[in-house]
Amino acid sequence: SPLWFNETVGEVISSGGDYGKTELGKGKRVLVEFVSANPTGPMHIGNARGGALGDSLSSVLQFAGYEVEREFYVNDAGNQIEKFGKSLSIRYMQIADGNKADVIASYGDDDVCRKIFEDEENFPMPEDVYKGVDIIEHAYNFYKINGGEFVNADEESRKCALVEYALPLNIDGLEKDLAKYRIVYDTWFRESSLHKSGAVKQIVDMLTEKGQTYEKDGAIWFKASDFGDDQDRVLVRANGIPTYFVPDIAYHYNKLVTRGFDKAIDILGADHHGYIARMKAALTALGVDASKLDIVIMQMVMLVRNGE
C-alpha cells in the first residue's frame, strides 16, 4: 500500500545505509576466491564478470554479518608458467640475436613454427607458446634493461630471469585493472607457496596413508570414485610430476584446515562444472567436511558486435 511504501522508504533513508543489515553470520569466517585469472597475460571479459559477481557476493555476506576475506589465487607455478617462460625466451632471443634461422634452430624442428600474424616479416613461433603482443613488449623491455646478457645463458636461467621480470608486472596489471572497478583483495595467495612449503607433497602422502591411492601405469591415482566422483583421478604422473589437481587440493585444505575458515566459496566458469565432484571427493577423503566448500558456477555468455 502507499502507506507501507512511504513508511519503508522513510526507514531506508533513516537507516543511513544499514537497512536490512543482519548478524546472521556473526562469528563465522568466509573466504571468497574469485577471478584468479592466469597471470601470464591480461584479464578477459569472463574474468571481469567473475570479479563483479565475487565482489558483490562478498559485500552481501559482509552485510549479513559474516567476516569475509576476498582472495585472488595466483597460478604462478606449473605448465602455464613454463609456457610463459618459453614464450618470453623465444621473443627475447629474436630481439637480442636478430638471426631468425639460428633462433628457430635452437628450439628444434621448425615444422612446429608458424606466423602469429599475417605479416610475412613476423617471427614464426612454436604452437605451444603464448603469441600475444604483451609477450613481445615484455621481452623488448627486458632487453632494454639487460641487453644481450642472457643470450648465451642456459635456457632455464634465461626463462627464470624473464619470468621473474615479467610475472610481477602482470600481477600488478591485474591488480590495477580490478581496482578500476573497485575490486580490492585482502589476500593474493600464490600457488608456488604450496610447493615451497611441501603442502603439495603432503596431500599425496596423506591420501596414501589413508589408503585412498593406488598405482597404475607408473602413476599415483586417487580413489575419487569411492567418494562420489564419476572416475578416479591421477595425482602424480608417471614422470613424477603432480597434476594440477594436487595443488588445488592443497589450496582448499589450506583454506578450510590450515587457516580454519568456516566456509570457502569459489566462483568458477561453467567449463569447470566437473571440478566440483572431484574436489569435494578429495576433501572428504582427507576427513574435511566438504559441505564447507561452496562452488558458484558462472554461466558463459556470448558477446555480439555488429551482429557477429
Q: Residues of each region from the PLM?
A:
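NTP-dependent nucleotidyl-transfer catalytic core
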Residues: S1-E308
